[in-house]
From Swiss-Prot:
This is Kallikrein-8. It comes from Homo sapiens (Human). Isoform 1 is predominantly expressed in the pancreas. Isoform 2 is expressed in adult brain and hippocampus. Isoform 1 and isoform 2 are found in fetal brain and placenta. Detected in salivary gland, uterus, thymus, breast, testis and kidney but not in spleen, liver, lung or normal ovarian tissue. Displays an 11.5-fold increase in Alzheimer disease hippocampus compared to controls and is overexpressed in some ovarian carcinomas. Its EC number is 3.4.21.118. Coiled coil: none annotated. The gene is KLK8. It is found in: Secreted; Cytoplasm. Optimum pH is 8.5. Active from pH 7-10. GO terms for biological process: keratinocyte proliferation; memory; neuron projection morphogenesis; protein maturation; proteolysis; regulation of synapse organization; response to wounding; synapse organization. The active site is at residues 73, 120, 212. Interacts with SPINK9. Glycans are attached at residue 110. Its main location: secreted. CDD domains: Tryp_SPc.
Length: 260
């Protein structure tokens, strides 16, 4: 098996979705984050989606009125952020689309090496403040590192099957548990650092392609950003790997504080 890959979207699949490839297709049994379920609409009000035109690139997380966290490997020259979405095709009121004016990857992220997943974190400054309410609001950053066995929630519009890819219209959620760091290191020898945390489940719940940049939420606080994992996704012995937010709190607060 080749190197585990980042979990950014394949945009041509999203274009098929917009073009009606799902018409007449029953999604009840398969439209889930692997091992997950459709989220209760707007239950993840911090969830963001990164778009380049009409192409879904990655997920993201609203952490301030005009700040979104995502994965550094999602960086593009130009994109917009959508907030308040549940269905990507149908609008139901709270959706907002705001251009990104500045992308700030972590300074130690190595964009020239596709095999280096360390420091996979990026802040996006939005042109305008988001209109906040019950369906669009920032999430709190965890003030401590998570512990093995802790139950957490992941969410995104990534593929719901693997290796065959099917991208859902609605936001999907899954419940996962934090892996001990040693078990994570054993699953991916030589690839795991303190800046990463692993999460998965014995039932194969996992994030996958298209979920990159989305949140790992534990006890209502942001603990991780979807980064990379096994290919195919959903292997109980190969958990999803997330950027470990607790290791980057100082950097996040410094950037947001300096930019206002």
């Amino acid at each position: 098996m080749g190197r585990p890959r980042p979990r950014a979207a394949k945009t041509w699949m999203f274009l098929l979705l917009l073009g009606g490839a799902w018409a007449g297709h029953s999604r009840a049994q398969e439209d889930k984050v692997l091992g997950g379920h459709e989220c209760q609409p707007h239950s993840q009000p911090w969830q963001a989606a990164l778009f380049q035109g009409q192409q879904l690139l990655c997920g993201g997380v609203l952490v301030g009125g005009n700040w979104v966290l995502t994965a550094a490997h999602c960086k593009k020259p130009k994109y917009t952020v959508r907030l308040g979405d549940h269905s990507l095709q149908n609008k139901d009121g709270p959706e907002q689309e705001i251009p990104v004016v500045q992308s700030i990857p972590h300074p130690c992220y190595n964009s020239s090496d596709v095999e280096d997943h360390n420091h996979d974190l990026m802040l996006l400054q939005l042109r305008d403040q988001a209109s906040l309410g019950s369906k669009v609001k920032p999430i709190s950053l965890a003030d401590h590192c998570t512990q093995p066995g802790q139950k957490c929630t992941v969410s995104g519009w990534g593929t719901v099957t693997s290796p065959r890819e099917n991208f859902p219209d609605t936001l999907n959620c899954a419940e996962v548990k934090i892996f001990p760091q040693k078990k994570c290191e054993d699953a991916y020898p030589g690839q795991i650092t303190d800046g990463m945390v692993c999460a998965g489940s014995s039932k194969g719940a996992d994030t996958c392609q298209g979920d990159s940049g989305g949140p790992l939420v534990c006890d209502g606080a942001l603990q991780g950003i979807t980064s990379w994992g096994s290919d195919p996704c959903g292997r109980s012995d190969k958990p999803g790997v997330y950027t470990n937010i607790c290791r980057y709190l100082d950097w996040i607060k410094k950037i947001i504080g300096s930019k206002g």
